[in-house]
Design a protein with these regions (language model features):
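Conserved phosphate-coordination/catalytic loops
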Residues: 74-81, 145-146, 169-170, 223-226
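C-terminal substrate-binding/active-site "lid" region of AdoMet-derived donor-dependent transferases
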Residues: 164, 170-241
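Membrane-proximal basic amphipathic "stem/tether" segments
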Residues: 1-74
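Generic enzyme active-site microenvironment
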Residues: 97, 118, 166, 190-191
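SAM cofactor-binding core of SAM-dependent methyltransferases
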Residues: 78-146
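A short acidic, Gly/Pro-enriched loop at the edge of an enzyme's catalytic core
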Residues: 154-164
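Surface-exposed interaction regions that form or flank ligand-binding interfaces
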Residues: 143-156
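Generic detector of well-ordered alpha-helical packing
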Residues: 100, 121, 169, 193-194
């Protein structure tokens, strides 16, 4: 009931106040070329206002569908909207991706990149994602409560080095501790929901290892909340940060 009311109000604002809404959404959905990617009055003068407004209307469509969608109606990760669009414009076909936690993001990366290896602990999600039978997407079911750490150490089961390692599942700090050795020299680590205090040990560890961070705080895709997605990178990284 509340969600539907909010959708109606947002839709009304869209049709009745396009000029003011462009300014608001330009703050919420800034251009990926602005590395700060946060609210700023200066962004109001950004020439990419129409692009920001387009992204905002896409966000409204995602909320209506209750899943994150791109402009073509295809699934996208449930990251912060700013991070989602940033990735959409910078991913390359030759990239290899590893995910701790499968989902709509797995389908998105499979469309954009060379290969995706995803670890999942939930049987239902595992069956849902594997049912798509995508050739360049491999999903593996791992025991979350194993004494041997089967889930967080699963990345060592594979010989590959990865351009992107996405930490968006369970035991995120432990996953972060394990993933550096499997990252290419120009690789990037993505931590979703990075605003949560419980992930501070993992973030501090990466900073101690010489990684810089790019935080993207914006509305969450398909949700009426704000969230943060952080990219941990080094000089000369594959996303051009």
């Amino acid at each position: 009931m509340v969600r539907n009311l909010l959708k109606f109000c947002l839709g009304l604002l869209y049709f009745r106040g396009r000029g003011k809404m462009r300014n608001f959404f330009c703050d919420c959905f800034p251009s990926p070329d602005n590395k700060l990617l946060k609210f700023s009055s200066g962004i109001r003068n950004n020439p990419n206002k129409d692009d920001a407004f387009k992204k905002a209307t896409q966000w409204l469509s995602s909320m209506s569908a209750d899943i994150s969608l791109d402009s073509n109606g295809l699934s996208m990760p449930s990251y912060s909207v700013a991070a989602m669009h940033f990735l959409d414009e910078r991913l390359k076909k030759e990239m290899k991706v590893f995910e701790f936690g499968s989902g709509l993001s797995s389908l998105f990366y499979a469309r954009k990149c060379k290969s995706v290896t995803s670890i999942e602990h939930n049987q239902e999600w595992f069956e849902k994602i594997t049912s798509h039978e995508i050739k360049n997407l491999a999903v593996f079911l791992k025991n979350l409560n194993s004494e041997n750490g089967d889930y967080e150490k699963a990345i060592f089961d594979f010989d590959e080095q990865y351009d992107l390692i996405v930490v968006d599942g369970r035991n995120r700090n432990k996953c972060i501790f394990n993933c550096i050795k499997k990252l290419t020299k120009n690789g990037v680590i993505i931590l979703d929901d990075s605003h949560r205090d419980k992930y501070l040990p993992g973030k501090q560890f990466l900073e101690e290892q010489g990684f810089k961070s790019l935080k993207m705080f914006s509305p969450a895709s398909s949700k009426l909340t704000f969230t943060e997605t952080t990219f941990f990178y080094r000089t000369g990284n594959c996303l051009g940060i």
